[in-house]
Amino acid sequence: MEIRRRPPNPKVKVANLEYAIPHEDGEPRNILEKILWEKDREVKVSRERVPLSELKAQINNLPQTKDFLGALRQSSTSPAVIAEIKKASPSKGVIRENFDPIEIALAYKLGGATCLSVLTDKSFFQGGFEVLVQVRKTVDLPLLCKEFIIQPYQIYQARVAGADAVLLIAAILSDQDLLYLRKVAISLGLTILVEVHDSNELKRVLDLEGFPLVGINNRDLKTFNTDLRTTKEVVKEHKKRISEQEVLLVSESGLFNSADLEEVSSYGAKAVLVGESLMRQPDIGLALKNLQGFK
């Protein structure tokens, strides 16, 4: 699935008149393109408000990051659970009306989560970096910044807000982008979770080497439907290389009960990322315990 970035369409100024000529590819073709095109605009605005130099200065005073990958490898639960803090999504709308990030983070910790994932996209998921800041002040678990990262600036934003790991989505990034953004993330002490949706994307990531944490999203980018067998299909051709590179696999989306966790574990997933199914429950901590089969 080709995901296009927003085509350049600079404004032209003639005398006192300023205008832009409509681009023939000026409209996004799907929800992911729509998100990315809006993200381009958001990052530009953020850079004008807070220059990169200011973010770098703030990072100098921050404590060391926590070992996100190490926590997953050493988790006492199998599979390890990355519990997600998410208020809404483009496909489902508002998932949790009574959204209190602090309360949710504490419930997840008590429920046995190994790590947490925090949505920071504001326009489509009603999240924000301020949510990540709140969660960082509340719990000492390793935190993933769940964002549509397309520029290095966002990685600095994540680090300042308290992230220990960042998400890179293979479908929206070139190989060159993945390698450069990895370099930036590593320089800031951040773990990278690179997300793939199909076998070809996983092959790309394995060919690049040096990405020991890979998430397989069970959600179809075209239909937004989920199928746990996606994890099985994506992995089956690459099992040997996954083992050789010591890649830890995370199964993402469509996980609702302990049977689902057992299923993706049988496909090779050592961790799972779960959000919506937990966020809809009145008692999030109890729901997480039940998901993991705790009595």
Curated annotation (Swiss-Prot):
Catalytic activity: 1-(2-carboxyphenylamino)-1-deoxy-D-ribulose 5-phosphate + H(+) = (1S,2R)-1-C-(indol-3-yl)glycerol 3-phosphate + CO2 + H2O
Membrane spanning stretches: none
GO molecular function: indole-3-glycerol-phosphate synthase activity; phosphoribosylanthranilate isomerase activity
GO biological process: L-tryptophan biosynthetic process
Pfam families from the UniProt entry: IGPS (PF00218)
Keyword Iron-sulfur: no
Keywords: Amino-acid biosynthesis, Aromatic amino acid biosynthesis, Decarboxylase, Lyase, Tryptophan biosynthesis
Listed EC numbers: 4.1.1.48
Coiled-coil positions: none
PROSITE patterns: IGPS
Pathway stated in the Swiss-Prot or TrEMBL entry: Amino-acid biosynthesis; L-tryptophan biosynthesis; L-tryptophan from chorismate: step 4/5
SUPFAM superfamilies assigned to the protein according to its UniProt record, in alphabetical order: Ribulose-phoshate binding barrel
Top class in the EC scheme: lyase
Assigned protein family: Belongs to the TrpC family.
Name of the protein this chain belongs to: Indole-3-glycerol phosphate synthase
Gene: trpC
